[in-house]
């Protein structure tokens, strides 16, 4: 009889703890990917959720750190980047700001260093807004691209490990063309030291 009672207590305990965990998971508004582009001289960040049940949320912000705060405050109080798969930047997005965003994510332990980075043009970003499933196609193309371009900076971790040479940071990002092909795009980012030298 005592054994049966213990088993019943355990079952009740597991049932209630399991339910609370499920509620917590459902409550979290998990982001699958983010796009960043420039519109009317302002930076626009759009957060696409993993479930796809909610519409993407767009905000105007100085950088990703501010964008996250605005989204949490006004739209998604339980915002989570723990399952973030990709960040897609407009090709004309400010390179220094892009690097600031990456460094911001580096400080967040919940964001995987294997999160992918992709560059795109306005047209491609517009297609994503119309059909976010396009990103799954780009993800598959990125896997094939990475096999043939191992030196490309396809993930956050690769950017974390890069060092400045001659006060410049040289990066090779994957770029998705209008035809859906991925090619390499070279980017050089001047360090703050070099910028100060040029001003003087």
Cite the ranges covered by each PLM segment:
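Membrane-proximal alpha-helical signals and transmembrane carboxylates
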Residues: 4-10, 16-200
């Amino acid at each position: 009889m005592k054994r049966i009672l213990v088993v019943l207590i355990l079952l009740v305990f597991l049932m209630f703890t399991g339910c609370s965990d499920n509620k917590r998971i459902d409550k979290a508004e998990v982001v699958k990917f983010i796009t960043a582009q420039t519109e009317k001289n302002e930076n626009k960040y759009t957060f696409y959720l993993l479930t796809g049940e909610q519409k993407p949320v767009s905000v105007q912000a100085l950088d990703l750190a501010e964008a996250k705060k605005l989204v949490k405050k006004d739209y998604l109080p339980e915002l989570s980047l723990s399952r973030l798969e990709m960040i897609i930047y407009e090709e004309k997005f400010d390179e220094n700001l892009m690097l600031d965003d990456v460094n911001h994510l580096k400080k967040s332990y919940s964001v995987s260093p294997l999160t992918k980075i992709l560059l795109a043009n306005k047209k491609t970003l517009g297609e994503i807004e119309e059909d976010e499933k396009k990103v799954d196609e780009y993800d598959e193309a990125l896997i094939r691209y990475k096999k043939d371009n191992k030196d490309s900076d396809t993930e956050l971790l690769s950017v974390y490990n890069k060092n400045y040479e001659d006060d410049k940071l040289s990066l090779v990002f994957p770029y998705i063309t209008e035809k859906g092909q991925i090619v390499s795009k070279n980017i050089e980012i001047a360090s703050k030291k070099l910028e100060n030298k040029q001003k003087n």
